[in-house]
Amino acid sequence: MTEDACRIDVWLWRARFFKTRSLAARVVEEGGVRLVRGQSRGPVDKPSRAVRCGDVLTFAQGPKWVVVRVEAFGERRGPATEARALYNVLNEAGATQRTQTPGA
């Protein structure tokens, strides 16, 4: 990948949303992650899909939906404080209950 993009499974793992990269890849393959980039939006089904700064991702974390904007890529899976700099949370601390698929 180029410096202005990162694989979605790698980014989700580096941002510490998933414990392993393979778990992040599985969730992506199962259609559990939605991507919004400009006017383009929809589910992501390939872990190799590139994310760019400014992209908005929606995915489930336990019983709640998480909506984040990608701010940076990072170079490693660092501590939580380092990972937190990779994104901005757009919903209020996961306040959206997971009762239905967002956008459905």
Map each language-model feature to its residues.
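Strongly charged
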Residues: 2-10, 14, 26, 34-104
